[in-house]
Amino acid sequence: MKIVVMSGGLSPERNVSLSSGSMICQALRERGHRVALVDLFFGMEGRGVSHPEELFDAPIPEQFKTVSPQAPDLAEVKRSRQDQSASQFGPGVLELCAMADCVFLAMHGTCGEDGRVQATFDMLGIPYTGAGYLSSALALDKDMTKQLVAGRPGVTTPRWETVDCAAEDLDAILTRTALPVVVKPLASGSSIGVYIANTQEELRSALEHSRAIGGRTVLEQFVKGREFSIAVLEGEALPSIEIIPKAGFYDYANKYQAGATEEVCPADIPAQWEQRMATSAKEVFRTLGLSVYSRADYIITPDGTPYFLEINTLPGMTPTSLVPQEAAAVGIGYGELCERIIHASLEARKKGE
């Protein structure tokens, strides 16, 4: 097959996405596919080619291969684009994608998971991997996701409130918020901008940071327990993975700094706990209208109750990322997983999903 792997983009998670993209590209090439790797935002800039077709044979650039433990400076990223266009699509990107049998979306965060790229491709008739535009948009919005799944069979969620830090009085929010509380941007991943506030001072600092980056913020009940992630692949749950940070919680630095977190897969938990979490994850998947694959995050309390936190429609896809680890636990190798995602996605697009 002729495949474009799309990564990067103008997202706080672009570095993670670039790394996912490079690994997917390499794995698919090793399985005999013609694969072009492209950064959504920069397109053909700096790739040393004169026509998009040449990217199918181009080497993988070094800057795609590593994940910085620091989130990127997006203002600097924007300034470094030569054409200074306001378009999210870099030069030659759409022309390149139109040449492919499928576009593998290795995007993460608002640029790629919010449904806009999917809607564009639907309009242009370009097949792509993962969920469709509407379910992608719903899943990225933490408040909308919680509203839709709270109370569904088998799904338990922490209490939450969504506030607009840019418009509301911070003192009023401080007064009514019970501590400890988890502070999350409404639409982001990789735990960027996530804080656990144990004091009024910590909460104020977190809210001020949220105000600076956009405003709409989810305040979520802090649930004490063990942290897990569980993937759904083609409607069926994979074995869960327990996440054990060596310090703090599973934030951006702990996710992408080597040795900062222990990950145990399959998770060493009672079968009943595993079944409850799998049932919940599949119900969330169905309720949001997702297709192909996803990864959901949970806290399980000491009594075995799984609390659903959020879901990722385009989870990290390096060989050591959570979903590939879970797939490997049932004998699905990394390259095979990438191919299964492509074939399932092509079927989903045919069905209009």
Regions found by a protein language model. Give the residues of each.
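Hydrophobic beta-strand scaffold residues
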Residues: 35, 127-128, 157, 181, ...
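Glycine-rich phosphate/pyrophosphate-binding beta-alpha loops
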Residues: 109, 191, 246, 312-326
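Phosphate-binding site of ATP-dependent enzymes
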Residues: 195-279, 300-307
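Active-site "cap" helix and flanking loop/linker of ATP-utilizing ligase/carboxylase catalytic domains
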Residues: 242-294, 325-353
